[in-house]
Swiss-Prot record:
The protein's assembly and partners: Monomer. Interacts with PABPC1; the interaction is RNA-dependent and stimulates ENDOV activity.
Site feature (Interaction with target DNA) residues: Y91
Known tissue expression: Highest levels detected in liver with high levels also found in heart, kidney and testis. Expressed at low levels in brain.
Ranges of Basic and acidic residues composition bias in the record: 260-270, 287-323
Gene from which this protein is expressed: Endov
Record protein name field: Endonuclease V
Highest taxon of source: Eukaryota
UniProt-annotated stretches for the region Disordered: 253-338
First-listed, main subcellular location of the protein, grouped into a coarse class: cytoplasm
GO BP annotations, alphabetical order: DNA repair
Native species: Mus musculus (Mouse)
Amino acid sequence: MAHTAAERPPEETLSLWKGEQARLKARVVDRDTEAWQRDPSFSGLQKVGGVDVSFVKGDSVRACASLVVLSYPELKVVYEDSRMVGLKAPYVSGFLAFREVPFLVELVQRLQEKEPDLMPQVVLVDGNGVLHQRGFGVACHLGVLTELPCIGVAKKLLQVDGLENNALHKEKIVLLQAGGDTFPLIGSSGTVLGMALRSHDHSTKPLYVSVGHRISLEVAVRLTHHCCRFRIPEPIRQADIRSREYIRRTLGQLGVAPAQRKDRSQKEQRPNACPQGGPGALADQGRPPECDGRDSSSDRKAPEPGFQEQKDQQLEGTGHQEDSDLWPPSPAWVQSPP
């Protein structure tokens, strides 16, 4: 039985949220604060984190929050923690953090208590940082609350401050010829809000990187590129894979039949555009990709559980399929979106 999140919060709540964002935004540090950030080869960086939230299909309440820590530069998972959570707030464009960040903060706190030696030195977040309606996206929110350096990595352009996914923007994307190529995202205000990054030689779709907390944009972009074995940075990619697998296992333990499970164990599908009314409007489920910079589930195919090592070994010796975020494609028992 599907669960539905609460209705749109009253305007008083949205006003309080805006005030909280403004208060926390004053604490954002958009410069390098760590010695490893100032080293061209990131000497001293050993642990990179990634976070993600996956949804039970057709259910806007039940979700899985996941935190992984990878060794650097090997990009091997050394820690993972996934938890089923109940989302109390609905999705409202521009306020994603109030829906998801509390659960991510809890995962960081659990890691600090259980394995403090494995605390990440930087966290890559599936979403935006200062590239946001009010300059304080989910990556900023998580960074300020945990005091960890954070990077926002989005797969869709958030169209704010005059940024548009128009013909000119598409022309700039075409000029990104190789992995590591970039162009700045300059708003109408003249502010550089982030960078478009071609993350992989075989991917034509850029990522949109922005500062979250305690890191400069230049270092954030360079590190994001260094973490990309495929299109999606490995910390976020692994958090996504493992959160989906955790949902599958959990549904199986609850006695959901495989035929039902395949319809419910993927990223929650999201509308194709911002809800009518623009930023701040309510979406029934999930996050419209153009609103918060996350892609639809079609770009996030899940591999077969237990297949990760074999897949990585195969890919290390073969060419990568163009624009595939999580290669190989989903097995037959995992439903792909229409």
